[in-house]
Amino acid sequence: MSCAPRSRPQEANHALRPLNVVLITIDTLRPDHLHCYGDSNIETPALDALAARGVLFESAVAQTPLTPPSHASIFTGQYPTVHHVRNTGGFVLPSSAKPLARILQDQGWDTAAFVSSAVLKKAIGFNNGFTVYDDQMPRQGNKRDFGEDAERKGGDTVDRALEWLNTQSGKPYFLWVHLYDPHMPYNPPGAFKDKYKSAPYDGEIAYTDGQVGRLLDAVSKKAPAGKNVVAVLSDHGESLSEHGEYTHGVFLYDATLRIAFMMAGPGIPSGLRVKQQVRSIDFLPTLLALLGGRAPGAIQGLNLVPAFSGQAVPTEISYEETVYPKLAMGWAELRGIRTNRWKYIRAPKPELYDLTQDPRETVNVLKQHPAEVGKLEAQLSNISGGGASESVETNTLDERQMTELKSLGYLSGFSPQHYDLNGQGSDPKDKIAILKLLYDAENSQTHLPEARRIAILEQALRQDPSNPSLYHQTGSELEKTGRYDDALRLYRSALAHGIENGRLHSRIADLSLRKGNKEEAISEYEKAAKLNPLDLESAVNLGTAYLEEGKVPEAERVFKWILSADSDNAAANNGLGLVAIQKKDPDAARNYFDRAVQLDPDLVEAQMNLGLLYEMSGDRARARHYFEEFLAKASPAQYGSIIPKVKQELATLQ
């Protein structure tokens, strides 16, 4: 087995064939739960039809079982060690990257993306090259949920994509639609819930297939098949209790790394099934080859088009990693190499599996094959950079954002977190009991009382007191039950255990603010922002706290920073409107409030602020309109003290 080079320089593209490109990525989709991959217990007619008119890769694998880094590999053709997106949260695709959307946009394509989860929000750099990047998640009551758990149903995402598609004419387009429904919790809608009552994960997949069908029907009506290249990939799979893991992210077994991968369009034979191992990094060079071009820059992926005519493509080696156990759990990270025959996993207790004899990876044969282990370890070291240790830091800001942050005078001390990926820490295999407790707490939200869920998490925390995720999840459950003081004590105890991250300081800040301790809240929000400036929800809270303390210049810098990171942030526009009022500039305030309402018609704070502004200017009709909008949408639980005052103001305007 020869050592593969880490990357291959590719020639720049000349003019590409003007074909429409439609990429659908389906989150958490195991290929062995699709009919076209052999599962007779599920109906997936849209994906079956796509496979029938194109190529299906029978042995496709992802580079990591995590959504952002896996998508980064799909779009760049690079391993995570090269594109630098290593985990969910805390990492940004560098602005210097040349992802697929940038390549096609530079060649004249219209580009649009519609994503279904906040883990792919534009602030982490995936909007590079997209003219439209729709990452708006649904509201939770009167608060838009920007947390990593925020998602929207595939039908809503496809609706938005179809609206955009209907505006396209003339130019070729690149449309990316990301569907998140197979991700836990599994709660398929309507008839799918009834039909797949005993297999809700399959129900989510069947529902998603229907949304794929809706989208592809519209694509085919917009232009004939000869004008469209369509690709479907899953970003990773789902363990479904195999190997003691219930979801994904912790281990590197095929349950979470085998993916669905199919393509159809000009230059792709119908009904072809490719058996050799291929990788998610191979998508980019393959697509560009179909368009008559080459992938630019240093990539690790290979063009699979020769495989369509039976030629071998040297995709024998696939690098795999998950740093999630280290960054989220405080355990050891895992790295591995997969070939057509072998799976080698570097861990505190390393593993080797013969996939031809043991495809479910149940018998570790490491001791029986020392020579193979040596070869695979050499391959792994070659790809991952040599030594057994690597120092990484969360790169929540790229160079453009750092420049913007400095120009605004915001956050003089950005403090990225450093991690040593040295294989040290508990082997995740030894923490299966913790994973079981976590799953029991997460998966029983409609079955167990809140107190029981908290007890389960506290049991896990006693067994693993240095696990950051356990503090976050236990604290969240305590907050849901109104045990705010207990949650605050828990978060502070996490700091005492040496755990520090932006999310932890943000939660301490929110709870301090609830107790009326504004000074501590501001201090904690500032710490959170220094660790992760792209936690925009915390940044909004920091700006609001500054305003309430009369620190108008500081508030203005924060809100402007937010808009530099996300120009469509409604809350930041509302905040700058409040700043403009403090600066006695009602015209600017009105513009900001109008923009906030335009971006988010349900942002009731902006509705109320417009009402007050129009009342002050003597425009009684508009003041009434916005006060009525506020009263129609404001939650009594959140705005109980304000609603009577707005009603009183409205009465004076009748």
Regions found by a protein language model. Give the residues of each.
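Structural marker of alpha-solenoid helical repeat scaffolds
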Residues: 463, 497-498, 531, 565, ...
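Generic detector of contiguous secondary-structure segments
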Residues: 392-405, 600-621
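Structural signature of tandem alpha-helical TPR/SEL1-like repeats
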Residues: 445-456, 480-493, 500-503, 514-527, ...
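Short helix/strand-capping connector loops at secondary-structure junctions
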Residues: 1, 355-359, 624-634
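TPR/TPR-like alpha-solenoid helical repeat scaffolds
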Residues: 612, 638-654
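Catalytic domains that recognize anionic headgroups
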Residues: 2-510, 514, 523, 534, ...
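A hydrophobic alpha-helix/topogenic segment detector
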Residues: 540-541, 574-576, 608-610, 615, ...
